[in-house]
Every structure is written in C-alpha cells, then in structure tokens.
C-alpha cells in the first residue's frame, strides 16, 4: 500500500527518514519484503508501490511540483522513479531513522538486485548502492536531469 498522506517537499515526493528501493521485478521486491520483515521492520514502517502506483504518483508530482522542487535533485529523482516505473520496477519505501536500519536495508537491496536505493534525509538524499562503474561525473540540473553515473 502506498504512503497516505503522500509526503512531499514543494510538490515532489520526499519521504523524510525513509529508504526508497526499486526492484526490476515484483518477485525480487517480494523476496526483499520478506527479509525486511525478518529483520524486525514493522508493517507500519513499510510501504509497497506497484509500477502503476509509482507511475501515477510520479506523473502527478511532475505535473504539480513547484519550481522550488528543482533547486535540489528531488524532482529529478521523481522523474527517475517515473522512468523506472514505466520499465516495470516495483518499489518499497521503508521508514529507517537509524543508521543500523539503513545498513540493513542497503544489504537487503543489494542481495535482491535492487536497481536503486536512496535514503531521504532533511538536506541530503544519499545513494546507498553502487550504480555504475564509471567515475566520470557531470553537473546535474533541472534541465539536464540526473548525472548518468547515478542512473
């Protein structure tokens, strides 16, 4: 079940103190979800999104976000979530305010082949799993989107 209410900053999805994990298949997400529950995360801490649910949410956010959402990478990350949802990726959003919880979720994400995993903090959104072998980065902006290294 998706988060209700839908947490945003300036109209863009921003689940503060949560880890957002995307999986290429619903099966991988289901296996990760079982492991997350085995790691003592409560049902109230875990939210599931089908590709259609994330696509609908991301399309709404892109259409309704304010220009302030473009100051950081929040809106670019929503666009990336939309892209992944259109490719059929499923998502888990897990409340994880403690560093030990984030470490556990990072290991689970890697074990089950997550495509992305990010920790949403107040001022920083942290990439939790390696995304690309390349070390050449380029600036990110609302016009150019996310650095290809982080895709």
Description of each model-found segment:
Residues 1-151:
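Positively charged, small/polar-rich N-terminal and surface patches that mediate targeting and assembly
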